[in-house]
Amino acid sequence: MEMAYTELNAKLCAFLDRTPNSFFAVKNIKEELAAAGFAELQENSRWQLQEGGKYYVSRNGSALLAFVIPQKDYLGFQVYACHCDSPAFKLKNNAEIVVDKKYVKLNVEKYGGMLLNTWLDRPLSVAGRVLCNVDGRLEARLVNVEQDLMMIPNLAIHMNREANEGVKLNAQTDMLPLIGSAATKDGLQKLLAEACGVTAEQIVDTELFLYNRMPATTVGLEQEYVAGGRLDDLQCVFAGLQGFMAAEAGESVPVFCMLDNEEVGSGTKQGAAATFLKDALQRINMALGRDEEDYLVSLANSLMLSADNAHAVHPNHTDKNDLTNKTYPNEGVVVKYSANQKYTTDAVSGALVQLLAKKANVPLQLFYNRSDMAGGSTLGNISTAQVAIKSVDIGLAQLAMHSAYEMAGVKDTAYLAELAQAFFTAAVAEAADGTYCLK
C-alpha cells in the first residue's frame, strides 16, 4: 500500500506541474480520456449515445464532463463534482508598465481569495488561452510559457522595518510582477505570439494567469505530505478521475464533472451555477429515448459527491477548528457539514457516504466550521440548485489553502481515489417507504 501511495502521488505531482490553470486541466484530462477510448461530444451537435459507450464534453475549454452508459434503463446518476480553478493573478490587457525607464512590470488583478504574501519572491510564469485572428477566423490557442519568467520582489526589511509586525499588501501597488528591464518592452507579446505561431498583431485577446513555477513534491521525515500549487482543488480532480477511470459502471451512470470559476462564486456559463451539469444529464436521458418522467425518476435515484478540499488542523493554530470535529492530513476523506447549508451533506447523504466508505474500507473524518466562523463556500449547494439530487460535500484535509504552494497528505489521495471508484460503481435507490438502498 505504501508503494501505491508513492506511485499515485508521483502522478499527482506530475499532474499539478503540467496543469497551471483550468484550461490545461481540461486539455490534460481530455487527452487521458481519449487515450482510454472515450469519444468527444459537442454541445452544438446532436448526441448519439449507445449502451456501453464512453463519452466526454467540454464547455468554454475550462469545464468538462465525462460519463459511461452502463445500460439504457439505468437507475440514476452517480455524479462526482469538483473544480479545476485556483486563486491566482490574472494578467490585464495592456499589461506592461515601464518604471523609471529601467524596469518592465505587469499589471495584474486578483482571481479568487488569494494569500497574497505567498506569491512574493517566487519564480512565476504565465499560462492560459490566447485568441488569434488566423485568416479571418478566431482560433483559441493554449500557451504555457515554461520558463522562470517573472517575480514579485519583496521590499527589503531595511526599507520596511515593520515587515515582521504584519504588512497589509495592496494588490495594485505591491503585487505587480517584474518581468524584465526596460529594454525588453513588448517582449511578453512577442513571446506569446511565438508560442502561438502567429504574429503579435494577430493576437486579439487573452485569458492568462500567473502560476508558481516551483515543482510539486513530497515532504516530511517519511515523505508523508504532498506540497505544490493548486492542490485545492486539483487533488480532488486527480483522485476523482483515477476512481472514474478504474470503476466498472453498475446500474447507474457514472458522471465525472469538473467545473470552473468556483473560486469566484461559480456564476459563469462553465461554473456550478450554470446549467452545464443539468444540460448534460438531460441530453443523456433524451439521447437514450427516455422521457421527462424517466429523467425525474432517475434524479430521485441519484447521488452527488461534491469534492473540494477541506481545512486541516493547523499545527500552529489549533484553535481555529471546531472543538470536537477535527481533520488531519492522511487520516481519511473529509465529510463536511454546515447548519446554514453551505455544505450539502444531510443525514441521508451523510449516512450513504458512510456506508459506501465502509464498503470500500476508506476512513472518513467529519468537518464543521467553528460556530463563530463563517468558513468558505464550495460548489455543491450551487450545483444542486440546478440539479436537485442528494448530495454530500467531501474533500481532503489540507494546510495553506489558497497559498501559492499548499500542503496535504499523501495517503488521502489514494483514499479518495478508492472512495470515488466505489462511488462510481454503486447505485442509490430510494424506496416508496422512505428507505434507501446502496447497490
Question: What role is predicted for each listed range?
Answer:
Residues 1-439:
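N-terminal hydrophobic/helix-forming segments and targeting peptides
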